[in-house]
């Protein structure tokens, strides 16, 4: 029991469970005895009915639309805390990770487009390598233990949070279907209620979650991706402490283990099951997977390192205390672990086009993320062991 408690208390545990979930999905999707069960599980219909309201989705879509909204709620809470009290609370503190994140989104997207611009279908996946998997990246960093400077961990956390915020904006602007004005009106009303609750000082988290459920349903029906509702709710839950209690921090504390040990692993299990049947060298070297691998493995560290260098060169920001530029480059490589966030964007980009494209995209994401994890870990380990 003591060893189990120590495992779940470590920062690496979430990343390790993600790896196990993804490996299990790959195994089950490619074994004759289990592949049928795996796909049947994902296609299981689940119906929710409340009065006249009815939502019919298969298990995969419930995981991607509903459970991932809880993940984005946690992201919203973390972003709000960092903006108001943490590493993004002042312009001077925020400048370096913000500039790094911008470079880490622009360059991978451009590199992907260099491979896929001529194909109007695969071109839609330009945002896939722009994302970073916070849990996985922090998990790999945690494998190096106390040798990693605290400032470097905070930098990676801040960079990944801004990265996810950028991914949220990209999803809202570029990956929405036909919009329902009525549903958007209901969503706007729900947001107004959340704002009113916050202004009136309502501190009961359950009230925000209840209104958030209405918002999620309205956003789902509107054509905008439903997970965005989670971020919005997170922004409105009060952060300020009263009698030593903060509703936002308390909810963040409650949600974190559920997200790390259930929701993200379940998402990985549901989405990482790529069939290797029919995989050929020609397929692996086609523009879609190559663009994703290049974007994650080369574009991410190149964009982050280049923009950080420019920020330092023109004195727009400074290195986090106790870190070196070589260590920042290593963190840039780790940010190429797109995994869950990249798979999520791939499902939005190609979900209504061709299942084969999603399969190739996932394969590219898995290869690019794995290579980024191995190279980033090795590079940072060498930099930490190097004499100052």
UniProtKB/Swiss-Prot annotation:
Task: Give the primary localization class.
Answer: membrane
What the entry lists under Gene3D superfamilies is as follows: Na+/H+ antiporter like domain (1.20.1530.10)
Instruction: Please name the InterPro entries in this protein's record.
Output: Na/H_antiporter_dom_sf, NhaA
Q: Which UniProt keywords apply?
A: Antiport, Cell inner membrane, Cell membrane, Ion transport, Membrane, Sodium, Sodium transport, Transmembrane, Transmembrane helix, Transport
Lineage top rank: taxon: Bacteria
Q: Is Membrane there in the keyword field? A: yes
Please give the start and end residues of each transmembrane region: 14-34, 59-79, 95-115, 125-145, 154-174, 179-199, 219-239, 254-274, 292-312, 328-348, 360-380
Name of one Pfam family that matches: Na_H_antiport_1
List the subcellular locations. Cell inner membrane
Topology within the bilayer: Multi-pass membrane protein
One of the protein's GO biological processes? regulation of pH
Tell me the GO molecular function terms: sodium:proton antiporter activity
Instruction: Show the catalytic activity.
Output: Na(+)(in) + 2 H(+)(out) = Na(+)(out) + 2 H(+)(in)
Can you supply one Gene Ontology CC term for this chain's record? Answer: plasma membrane
Which PANTHER family would you find in this protein's record?
NA(+)_H(+) ANTIPORTER NHAA, SODIUM ION/PROTON ANTIPORTER NHAA-RELATED
Protein task: Na(+)/H(+) antiporter that extrudes sodium in exchange for external protons.
Query: Which family does the record assign?
Result: Belongs to the NhaA Na(+)/H(+) (TC 2.A.33) antiporter family.
Q: What is this protein called?
A: Na(+)/H(+) antiporter NhaA
What is the organism of origin for this protein? Answer: Salmonella typhimurium (strain LT2 / SGSC1412 / ATCC 700720)
């Amino acid at each position: 029991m003591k060893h189990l408690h120590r495992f779940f208390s470590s920062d690496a545990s979430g990343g390790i469970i993600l790896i196990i979930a993804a490996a299990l999905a790959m195994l089950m999707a490619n074994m004759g005895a289990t592949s049928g069960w795996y796909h049947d599980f994902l296609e299981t219909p689940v119906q929710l009915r409340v009065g006249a309201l009815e939502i019919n989705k298969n298990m995969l879509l419930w995981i991607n639309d509903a459970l991932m909204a809880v993940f984005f709620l946690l992201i919203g809470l973390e972003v709000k805390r960092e903006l108001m009290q943490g590493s993004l609370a002042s312009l001077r503190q925020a400048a370096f990770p913000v500039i790094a994140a911008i470079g880490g989104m622009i360059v991978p997207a451009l590199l992907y487009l260099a491979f896929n611009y001529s194909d109007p279908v695969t071109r839609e996946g330009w945002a896939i390598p722009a994302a970073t998997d916070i849990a996985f990246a922090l998990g790999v960093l945690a494998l190096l233990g106390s040798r990693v400077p605290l400032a470097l961990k905070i930098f990676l956390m801040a960079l990944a949070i801004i990265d996810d915020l950028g991914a949220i904006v990209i999803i809202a602007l570029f990956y929405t279907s036909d919009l329902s004005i009525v549903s958007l009106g209901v969503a706007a009303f729900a947001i107004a209620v959340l704002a009113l609750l916050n202004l009136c000082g309502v501190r009961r988290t359950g009230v925000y979650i209840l209104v958030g459920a209405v918002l999620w349903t309205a956003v789902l029906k509107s054509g905008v991706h439903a997970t965005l509702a989670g971020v919005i709710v997170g922004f409105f839950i009060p952060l300020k402490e009263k009698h030593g209690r903060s509703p936002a921090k308390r909810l963040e504390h409650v949600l974190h283990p559920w997200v790390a040990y259930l929701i993200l692993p379940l998402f990985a299990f549901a989405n990482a099951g790529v069939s290797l049947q029919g995989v050929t060298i020609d397929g692996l070297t086609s523009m879609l997977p190559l663009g994703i691998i290049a974007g994650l493995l080369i574009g991410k560290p190149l964009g982050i390192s280049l923009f950080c260098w420019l920020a330092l060169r023109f004195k727009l920001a400074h290195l986090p205390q106790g870190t070196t530029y070589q260590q920042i480059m290593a963190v840039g490589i780790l940010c190429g672990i797109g995994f869950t966030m990249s798979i999520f964007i791939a499902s939005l980009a190609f979900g209504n086009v061709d299942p084969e494209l999603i399969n190739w995209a996932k394969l590219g994401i898995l290869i690019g993320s794995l290579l980024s994890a191995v190279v980033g870990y090795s590079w940072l380990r060498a930099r930490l062991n190097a004499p100052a």
